[in-house]
A protein has these predicted regions:
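A compositional/biophysical signature of low hydrophobicity enriched in polar/charged and small residues
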Residues: 1-99
């Protein structure tokens, strides 16, 4: 999973809605938010691998008309999701078994 900051240009009469629609229609996008700050959007993208997410950003997201730039942040570890604290000890044990 990755959080992607998207810089975009607004369009006359519709603002950011059209570029947002071009982005949120992709099945890889699980959540999308218009935000205040240095970027216009935060997009949550789910993929099986970092490469899959990177390919989505490079081949589908970045070329969209109206998208000026992106910054991708890969989630390395989760501590709390949807109000639920992730059991770190259990997570660490699973990692040990896999390696």
């Amino acid at each position: 999973m990755a959080l992607i900051e998207v810089n975009a240009s607004p369009e006359r009469d519709c603002g950011y809605d059209k570029v947002a629609e071009k982005i949120y229609r992709y099945p890889e996008v699980s959540n999308m938010y218009l935000i205040s700050g240095r970027s216009e959007f935060i997009v949550i993208v789910k993929g099986r691998t970092m490469r899959e997410v990177a390919d989505f950003v490079g081949q589908k997201l970045a070329p969209i008309e109206g998208v000026k730039g992106t910054a991708t942040y890969f989630v390395l570890k989760q501590y709390k999701v949807e109000g639920v604290i992730i059991d770190q000890q259990e997570d660490d044990q699973e990692r040990l078994l896999v390696t």
